[in-house]
C-alpha cells in the first residue's frame, strides 16, 4: 500500500517520537514530546507553541488537538493578514492532518476488524470522525486496487 506525503510525514513524526501504538496517542504525551503547552478554553486555537483546546468530550478534545497540531507543524503566518481562500485551504489541510494524526494509517492497518466502532474505540475518537477516516481509508484501498 502506498503512502501519501502526509501519511509519510506522520509516520516519520511518530517514529521519531517513539510513538508506535494507539495507546500512546494522548494529548499530554504528544504535547510533551512536541514541546507545546496545552490550555483549555472556550475555543480552539494556536498561539506560537501554545495550543488552546475547546473544552468538550475527551474524543473532541483529541480531534481538536490534532487539528491545531496540524497548524503548528505545517503552517506559518498570521491568519489576520491572509486571504480568505488561503485561510480556508489551511483549515482544510489542518482537518485532513487531524484525521491522519489522530488515526495514523500505519496503526490503522494493524487493526484486526476495521469498522467504525473499532476505530472509535481504538483511537478514542467520536463516531463521525471514525466514519470519515474509515471512508478515507477505504477510498485509498479502492484507488490502490484500480477498481
Regions inferred by a protein language model and the residue ranges of each:
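Active-site hotspot residues in diverse enzymes, especially metal/ion-binding acidic/histidine motifs
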Residues: 1-147
